Amino acid sequence: MHGTRPSLADITLILEEIPEIIDLHCDEQFDSSEEENNHQLTEPAVQAYGVVTTCCKCGRAVRLVVECGPEDIRDLEQLFLKTLNLVCPHCA
């Protein structure tokens, strides 16, 4: 376009091949067993967590490693915040 206002003479249409229209919808259906397998893959896996706390008798550091899921490690944390205490091997 030239000038401050567009006019029809300024517009040039270049017509080449018309793009092919493609259907993007997927009509594929899964068996129920495949859906269950896919659901199982997305569940959280068991993971190792290092826990460091203090002995309730002498105050020494007590270290342990647990394997559990994310929800279980939160439950363990809640137990430590409430009444669960660990005792070191020296005080046991």
UniProtKB/Swiss-Prot annotation:
Region (E7 terminal domain): 1-43
Family annotation (InterPro entries): Papilloma_E7 (IPR000148)
SUPFAM superfamilies listed in its UniProt record: E7 C-terminal domain-like (SSF161234)
Motif (LXCXE motif): 24-28
Zn-finger region bounds: unnamed: 55-91
Keywords: Activator, DNA-binding, Early protein, G1/S host cell cycle checkpoint dysregulation by virus, Host cytoplasm, Host nucleus, Host-virus interaction, Inhibition of host innate immune response by virus, Inhibition of host interferon signaling pathway by virus, Interferon antiviral system evasion, Metal-binding, Modulation of host cell cycle by virus, Oncogene, Transcription, Transcription regulation, Viral immunoevasion, Zinc, Zinc-finger
A Pfam family reported for this protein in Swiss-Prot or TrEMBL: E7
Name of this chain's protein: Protein E7
